[in-house]
Amino acid sequence: MSLHLVIIDALNLIRRVHSAQPDPNDITRTAETTTRTLQRIINEAQPSHMIAVFDHHLSDRGWRAELLPTYKANRKPMPDVLQQGIDAIQDAWWQLGIDSLLSEGDEADDLVATLACKVAAHQEKVTIISTDKGYCQLLSPTLQIRDYFQQRWLDEPFIAQEFGVTPAQLTDYWGLTGVSSSQIPGVAGIGPKAAKEILNQFSSIEEAYASPELPAKYRKKLDPHIEMARICKQVSALKTDIELGFNLQDIRFNSSSAD
């Protein structure tokens, strides 16, 4: 069997399932629903290796908030009842044969990105299960992102249609436009249309900033805010060099556990 690593963005999945439950206090039902969801994902993906990555609920906003104090400053905390039920959900997933990785100081996104890129760099297949478009900056011939809830692939054609740039330009795009859901401001006065025009003409923020060909209407917006653009790009970029402390053999998926 060829290697296929499936990485679950755990809280991304759990929060969406939990928010759709008729009784938010019924964590048993949330656990059962997420387990059925994972069973369907397993049946579709046929993974050889699988892991669920969790943000540690006590972790702060990390290095990104040090660079950009507004980063996720207004994000709603996890509901207490759900936070208290995470262990039960992890236990249910363990019964399926899926181990959990909890972040300790790093955001789950960076752990997912590091693991995915390490495996994809060896030309092995990786699927990230998440609705988070931030992972699309990682896209490669062997690394794909699946939005399970919309039943769609967040692939290059999707990125081209959604943003009008390439996956490699996404962090530059967000450096210009910002990301409202994470309180990343971007450059004042540069929205999606302007960012697309700039990045269709230039490969990056730095190339645009250095070029005498940058149109004056964008120059007057970018020049006073170039440092903010750089910070927003850096905050939008996922880290791929975290020490993980385990190897692939540790997360080999035993399909008999999911039967």
From Swiss-Prot:
It comes from Vibrio cholerae serotype O1 (strain ATCC 39315 / El Tor Inaba N16961). K(+) binds at residues 176, 185, 187, 190. Residues 165-255 form the 5'-3' exonuclease domain. NCBIfam families: PRK09482.1. Has flap endonuclease activity. During DNA replication, flap endonucleases cleave the 5'-overhanging flap structure that is generated by displacement synthesis when DNA polymerase encounters the 5'-end of a downstream Okazaki fragment. Binds 2 Mg(2+) per subunit. Only one magnesium ion has a direct interaction with the protein, the other interactions are indirect. Binds 1 K(+) per subunit. The potassium ion strongly increases the affinity for DNA. CDD domains: H3TH_53EXO, PIN_53EXO. The gene is xni. One of its GO terms (biological process) is DNA replication, Okazaki fragment processing. It is an enzyme of class 3 (hydrolase). Residues 189-194 are annotated as: Interaction with DNA. HAMAP family: Xni (MF_01192). This is Flap endonuclease Xni. One of its GO terms (molecular function) is 5'-flap endonuclease activity. Pfam families: 5_3_exonuc, 5_3_exonuc_N. Its cofactor is Mg(2+); K(+). Belongs to the Xni family. Keywords: DNA-binding, Endonuclease, Hydrolase, Magnesium, Metal-binding, Nuclease, Potassium. It comes from the Bacteria. Its EC number is 3.1.-.-. Mg(2+) binds at residue 109.
